[in-house]
């Protein structure tokens, strides 16, 4: 019983941590470009301070990208993260 409970907790934590990046559009094809400051653009799920730092989707007609404030249980508050989502999605 203890082993099963431990496995369930592990799976739940793994899904919460890994699933968060996928919810932010990590699996959507995007362009990895160099910014004017010489750094690469930030991928979905990375922390950001403004929209220009984030990578843009390959298909910009279907997908929108940017930097938005989201809740982070690990940080214990709100953080700003890059995202890519479908324009037609109600979550975007």
From Swiss-Prot:
Q: By its UniProt entry, which Pfam families does this protein fall under?
A: Cys_Knot_tox (PF17486)
GO cellular component entries: extracellular region
At the top level, the lineage of the source is: Eukaryota
Where found, per UniProt? Answer: Secreted
Which regions span the lipid bilayer? none
Could you say which residues form the signal peptide?
Answer: 1-19
Q: In which tissues is it expressed?
A: Expressed by the venom gland.
Q: Which UniProt keywords apply?
A: Disulfide bond, Ion channel impairing toxin, Knottin, Neurotoxin, Secreted, Signal, Toxin
Chief subcellular location: secreted
Give the family this protein belongs to, as stated in its UniProt record. Belongs to the neurotoxin 21 family.
Q: Tell me, what does this protein do in biology?
A: Potent insecticidal toxin with probable ion channel impairing activity. In vivo, reversibly paralyzes all flies within 30 minutes, even at low dose (0.3 nmol/g).
Any domain commentary?
The presence of a 'disulfide through disulfide knot' structurally defines this protein as a knottin.
Listed name of the protein: U21-hexatoxin-Hi1a
**Species name:** Hadronyche infensa
